[in-house]
C-alpha cells in the first residue's frame, strides 16, 4: 500500500503539471499569434481568463463532489449516463492526440530556428515523430517520474517569461504598445473574437488535474487546489508577459517571428542571450509534451478500465505505467505526423490547434452541465450549489463562444469527429445498456 502511494503525485507536482501543460505548449508562440491581431488582444485575454477561471472553479467543484473515477468522463456520466462518459473521454482523447502532434511540430520548428537549420517537410515530419517517441519513452517510469521531469522542464518557460514580466518594463515603450493596438483596423468584436481561440489554446490543460485523478494522493483535496492554482498562476503570467513583449518588439517583427521570446531577449540584451532563451523554450516545450503524453495515456486507461476502449490501454507495468497503451498512442500520432507533412507547416499547425480546441471543448460542456446533478447527489446545500451552478453556466457560455470563434472549418471537422463518437459508442453500448436494463 505504501509503495503504491509513493508512486502517486502530491499537490505541488500536480499543480506544476497543470501549469506546465498550459504554459509549455501555449505561451511559446503566443506573442507572434497575438501580434497578428494587435495589442487589442488584451481584451480577449481578459475574456478568456474569466472563462477559464469559471471552468477551473467548476472543475474544482466536480473534483470535490464526484464519486466516480475517470476525470471528466466520470463527471459527464452523472447527467448523460455511460454514453456521456464515453463521449467526454473520446473527444478529450482525440483532442490530446491532435494537440500533442501540434506541440511536437512547434518544438521542432523552434529547435530548427535555434540551430539555424533548414529542414525539408519530410525531415520536419520525421523529427516530429522522434520528439513524440522520446517524450513517450520518458513516461515509462510511472506517474512520479513524469511529475519530477515536468517540474524541472517548466523552469525553461518560467525563468524567461517571469523574468520578462519583471525586468521587461525597463525596455517597455508605451508609444509602441499603443501603435500596435489594432494594426489591421479590424472591427472591435471581430478583432477580439479572432484572438479567443488563440488564448484558449494557451489555457488548455486546466482540466489535466482531473484527467490524472487516479494517480493523485488525496484527490478530493488536491485536485481543486491544483486546478485553481495552476490556472490562476498561468493567467497572470500570460497577460503580463504577452503585453510587455508587445511594448518591446515592433508589431511587424513580432508577427513574423518564429521565436518571439528569443527575439525580445535578443533586442533587450544580445543575440546570444536570445539563443539561450530559445534553448530554454525548446526544453519547456518537450516537458509540456511529456506531461501531455502521460495525461493522454491516463485518459485512454480510464476509458479502457470502464470498458469503452480496447483492453491494451489498461495494461500497466510494475510502476503503474500503461506502457502498451502509450506505444499504441504514439504509433497513431506518428501516422498523424506523417499525414500532416506539408510545405506550409504553420498553416497545418493552425488547423491542428483549432481542431484540438473544438474537440477539447466538448467534454468541458458536458462537465459543466453535469455539475447540477453532481451537487444534488452529494447533498450540497442549495445556496452553495446555486453559486457553483452559475459559475459552471458562465464557463459553458464561454465554451460556446470559443467554439464560435474557432472558425467554420474547425467546427465542421470537429463535428464530424464528435458524431463519429456516437457511432463508436454504438459498437460498445450493449455491454453497458443491456446491463442497465437487466440490472
Swiss-Prot record:
Changing residue 78 to L: Uptake activity decreases more than excretion activity. It is found in: Cell inner membrane. It is a multi-pass membrane protein. Changing residue 201 to F/L/Y: Strong decrease in both uptake and excretion activities. HAMAP family: Putrescine_transp. Belongs to the amino acid-polyamine-organocation (APC) superfamily. Basic amino acid/polyamine antiporter (APA) (TC 2.A.3.2) family. This is Putrescine transporter PotE. It comes from Escherichia coli (strain K12).
Amino acid at each position: 500500500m505504501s509503495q503504491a502511494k509513493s508512486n502517486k503525485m502530491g499537490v505541488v507536482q500536480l499543480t506544476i503539471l497543470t501549469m506546465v501543460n498550459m504554459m509549455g505548449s501555449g505561451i511559446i508562440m503566443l506573442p507572434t499569434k497575438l501580434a497578428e491581431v494587435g495589442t487589442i488582444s488584451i481584451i480577449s485575454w481578459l475574456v478568456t481568463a474569466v472563462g477559464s477561471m469559471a471552468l477551473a472553479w467548476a472543475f474544482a467543484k466536480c473534483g470535490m463532489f464526484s464519486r466516480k473515477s475517470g476525470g471528466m468522463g466520470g463527471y459527464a456520466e452523472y447527467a448523460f449516463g455511460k454514453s456521456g462518459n464515453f463521449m467526454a473521454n473520446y473527444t478529450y482523447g482525440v483532442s490530446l492526440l491532435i494537440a500533442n502532434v501540434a506541440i511536437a511540430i512547434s518544438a521542432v520548428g523552434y529547435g530548427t530556428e535555434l540551430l539555424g537549420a533548414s529542414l525539408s517537410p519530410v525531415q520536419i515530419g520525421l523529427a516530429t515523430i522522434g520528439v513524440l517517441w522520446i517524450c513517450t519513452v520518458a513516461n515509462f517510469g510511472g506517474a512520479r517520474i513524469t511529475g519530477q521531469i515536468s517540474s524541472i522542464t517548466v523552469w525553461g518557460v518560467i525563468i524567461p517569461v517571469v523574468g520578462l514580466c519583471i525586468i521587461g518594463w525597463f525596455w517597455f515603450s508605451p508609444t509602441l504598445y499603443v501603435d500596435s493596438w489594432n494594426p489591421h483596423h479590424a472591427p472591435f468584436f471581430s478583432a477580439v473574437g479572432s484572438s479567443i481561440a488563440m488564448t484558449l489554446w494557451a489555457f488548455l490543460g486546466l482540466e489535466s488535474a482531473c484527467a490524472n485523478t487516479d494517480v493523485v494522493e488525496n484527490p478530493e483535496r488536491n485536485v481543486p487546489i491544483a486546478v485553481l492554482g495552476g490556472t490562476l498562476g498561468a493567467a497572470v503570467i500570460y497577460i503580463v508577459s504577452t503585453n510587455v513583449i508587445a511594448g518591446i518588439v515592433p508589431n511587424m517583427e513580432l508577427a513574423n517571428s518564429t521565436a518571439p521570446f528569443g527575439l525580445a531577449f535578443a533586442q533587450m540584451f544580445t543575440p546570444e542571450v536570445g539563443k539561450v532563451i530559445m534553448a530554454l523554450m525548446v526544453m519547456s516545450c518537450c516537458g509540456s509534451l511529456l506531461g501531455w503524453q502521460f495525461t493522454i495515456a491516463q485518459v485512454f486507461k480510464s476509458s479502457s478500465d470502464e470498458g469503452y476502449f480496447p483492453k491494451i490501454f489498461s495494461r500497466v507495468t510494475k510502476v503503474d505505467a500503461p506502457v502498451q497503451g502509450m506505444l499504441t498512442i504514439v504509433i497513431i500520432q506518428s501516422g498523424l505526423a506523417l499525414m500532416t507533412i506539408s510545405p506550409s507547416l504553420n498553416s497545418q499547425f493552425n488547423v491542428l490547434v483549432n481542431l484540438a480546441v473544438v474537440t477539447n471543448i466538448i467534454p468541458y460542456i458536458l462537465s459543466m452541465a453535469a455539475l447540477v446533478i453532481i451537487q444534488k447527489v452529494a447533498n450540497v446545500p442549495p445556496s452553495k450549489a446555486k453559486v457553483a451552478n452559475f459559475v459552471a453556466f458562465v464557463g459553458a457560455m464561454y465554451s460556446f463562444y470559443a467554439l464560435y470563434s474557432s472558425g467554420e472549418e474547425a467546427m465542421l471537422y470537429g463535428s464530424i469527429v464528435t458524431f463519429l463518437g456516437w457511432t463508436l459508442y454504438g459498437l460498445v453500448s450493449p455491454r453497458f445498456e443491456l446491463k442497465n436494463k437487466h440490472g
